[in-house]
A protein has these predicted regions:
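C-terminal active-site/capping subdomain that shapes the small-molecule cofactor and substrate pocket
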Residues: 99-214
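Active-site-lining helix/loop region of Rossmann-like oxidoreductase modules
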Residues: 1-138
């Protein structure tokens, strides 16, 4: 399950969601400044504004602020979105895997109102029963960017959010634990700034390679 930031759509999408937040805030500004205002009345007014058709939704099609959109990209006609298809196709292409060697990946892709840094919740079935500490060690030692976050509330709240990951090449990986489905089933949650990894960083690396060959 991916939780993808507004910036995945582009600059205009980021502006749109910020504008929606602004308009929703303006709708209940008086109530927010009144400690005696009932929260249910504030919620009613926000929901009415979201449903009014007055918010700018030219980019996303529906309000994203204070909500989410459980569909990204085009409809492939088989119940799957193109973004969900890409997760399997691109992963195996990057790994160079074909046929029976392919890693089977599937899930839902959801747009959320974070500004940048995509997140994903993973359910993995391993081929053998490994201790959690060993899994954490493998992840931590694989590359310089993966940063294991201890599976505690405080560490998760501090280091495993889009706010914590944005602007950095580090990829926090946390919530690693055994699942009740069986000892080979492992959960994990990751966050990464796709504006760096998906755009700026590949270009920077290509330029370094090109400059090195001049």
């Amino acid at each position: 399950m991916t939780y993808q930031a507004a910036s995945g759509g582009g600059a205009r999408h980021m502006r749109e969601v910020l504008g929606q937040f602004r308009d929703l805030g303006n709708e209940v500004s008086a109530e927010l400044n009144d400690p005696a205002a009932a929260i249910l009345e504030i919620d009613r007014k926000v929901l009415a504004k979201q449903r009014s058709g007055e918010l700018d939704t030219a980019q996303f099609g529906v309000p994203l602020s204070g909500s989410l959109i459980p569909w990204i990209d085009s409809d492939l006609g088989n119940g799957q979105s193109r973004e969900e298809w890409k997760s399997d196709a691109e992963t195996n292409k990057i790994l160079g895997l074909e046929g029976d060697d392919r890693v089977i990946m599937d899930g839902l892709c959801v747009r959320i109102a974070a500004m940048r840094s995509h997140s994903q919740a993973l359910t993995m079935k391993l081929t053998e029963d490994l201790p959690v500490a060993e899994i954490e060690r493998i992840i931590a030692e694989d590359n310089q960017w993966a940063q294991v976050v201890p599976n505690t509330k405080d560490a998760t709240m501090e280091g495993l959010t889009p706010v914590a990951a944005s602007g950095s090449l580090n990829i926090p990986v946390g919530r690693i634990r055994k699942l009740a489905m069986g000892p080979q089933y492992i959960s994990a949650f990751t966050v990464g700034d796709q504006l760096l990894w998906g755009a700026a960083e590949p270009v920077r690396r290509m330029l370094k390679i090109a400059v090195g060959k001049l």
